[in-house]
Amino acid sequence: MAAPMDRTHGGRAARALRRALALASLAGLLLSGLAGALPTLGPGWRRQNPEPPASRTRSLLLDAASGQLRLEYGFHPDAVAWANLTNAIRETGWAYLDLGTNGSYNDSLQAYAAGVVEASVSEELIYMHWMNTVVNYCGPFEYEVGYCEKLKSFLEANLEWMQREMELSPDSPYWHQVRLTLLQLKGLEDSYEGRLTFPTGRFNIKPLGFLLLQISGDLEDLEPALNKTNTKPSVGSGSCSALIKLLPGSHDLLVAHNTWNSYQNMLRIIKKYRLQFREGPQEEYPLIAGNNLIFSSYPGTIFSGDDFYILGSGLVTLETTIGNKNPALWKYVQPQGCVLEWIRNIVANRLALDGATWADVFRRFNSGTYNNQWMIVDYKAFIPNGPSPGSRVLTILEQIPGMVVVADKTAELYKTTYWASYNIPYFESVFNASGLQALVAQYGDWFSYTRNPRAKIFQRDQSLVEDVDTMVRLMRYNDFLHDPLSLCEACSPKPNAENAISARSDLNPANGSYPFQALRQRAHGGIDVKVTSVALAKYMSMLAASGPTWDQLPPFQWSKSPFHNMLHMGQPDLWMFSPVKVPWD
């Protein structure tokens, strides 16, 4: 006879885990021809509890006699690298990763070790995040053979080109940092798969392994460039809001960001890295400028992806996605001569001391993928309670395929007292080249830089920001049922939960009428907020809240939502978390 249905919370979790494991097994079978996209389960999955403990620390040690690497529990000061994961997802919506490397060892070993220890403390979260987000990518149930083969070939060719460039330029700081980034990814994947083999020469990165977690943003543009039938971003799909606010009298400069993403991506980790890498491969090079950094991130991802970083160099770097709607530009997306955005992002954060240098590093080898508006705030140039320094406080960069435009916008920040970013290009040349004029002609002001709903809400409400708490309030704002700026005249019903600083597209009626897909009901919206200030950034800290906004709206609850059948392993059912000050010791 059939076993009785277990309707308890634990029973539902167990059924979800069994379903996920079955999917994982099937995915491994179907994807074996494409290099096996699903990584082998880590040793943590031999335990009964699918979630990590409240706290876990591990160190990677090098045995001097044998030359072997080994993982040990706890902190060991002579280790190559160490990491602690504090799992507070059920309490705050966040886990916290604190990772450090030992400058007594060479950079390459440090980088590999950083990946190893991160995977060793977060393997359960990595597995669940993989299952929630990318297990079906290129199979088993959404499998476009032609596209997946093209993607695999593109990534293999790009990895091979970068390996050649690293070999041709062994003394280059740029390529040294690219190599360290790939070694960190290699260590992450090796550790998760239960092997520790430090590569001394060339090394391989699986094109459809953990690289998929790093290139989530790049895929938004690789998909249309490689002619995928069903592409990731829908027309008008927003991906983040950001606000930089100069307070009256210049007594503070606040930087805030909220990420718009699928709700399946809500397994979150705030990470702190302390990396003792040198700028270049020789001992005489100084330490990288951005060797200390904190950022909002995801399991198995070695950069932010949101993106939001506080750097020890005094910079805060963040972006919102602008995309590309001009098919003629996809010709610039090629595997040779380009470095994917996720790597350029990391390298710029490591090497730059100011906004201009950051832009110079980032714009090299433009891939035309993960096309964003970047904001680089330099707190070193900001004078609290003082006049405008004239330049250097705010640098804006916009990238699309074949084009990168950069400008110092300090003067504009001091004139208007704010800079808002909401997925539409600021520079006219980028706006026109990316094909947005056609969308304005077809759909109206929704795609306009100055008349978009978020542009108007920011313009109306930015003056209400007085401190970090009121900044959080604005960045979580969504009163779509009552705010006239949230109305969509071509929609039925007209109030639309996408038209807010922090979207809640799950609240749009499923049976409504909408002019384009982004305005429909989706398991998508603003899933966090991060805010920093002069004082917070000085101590590498931020105020952060995880999950969809619930300030003016009912909190999101998986079990009561239209999307309760979506896989969301490891996530709380009810998302009703208040902001927390990130607790670094």
Swiss-Prot record:
Biological-process GO terms, alphabetical: phospholipid catabolic process
Record keywords: Disulfide bond, Glycoprotein, Hydrolase, Lipid degradation, Lipid metabolism, Lysosome, Signal
Signal peptide per UniProt: 1-35
Family listed: Belongs to the phospholipase B-like family.
GO-annotated cellular components: extracellular region; lysosomal lumen; lysosome
Signal as UniProt keyword: yes
Subunit structure: Interacts with IGF2R.
Protein localization: Lysosome lumen
Protein name, UniProt field: Putative phospholipase B-like 2
Enzyme class, first EC level, given as a word: hydrolase
InterPro entries the UniProt entry points to: PLipase_B-like, PLipase_B-like_dom1, PLipase_B-like_dom2, PLipase_B-like_dom3
Molecular functions (GO terms): phospholipase activity
Glycosites: N84, N102, N106, N227, N432, N511
Disulfide bond annotation, renumbered to this chain: C138-C148, C488-C491
EC nos: 3.1.1.-
Modifications the protein undergoes after translation, according to the UniProt entry: Glycosylated; contains mannose 6-phosphate sugars.
Role according to the record: Putative phospholipase.
Species assigned in the record: Rattus norvegicus (Rat)
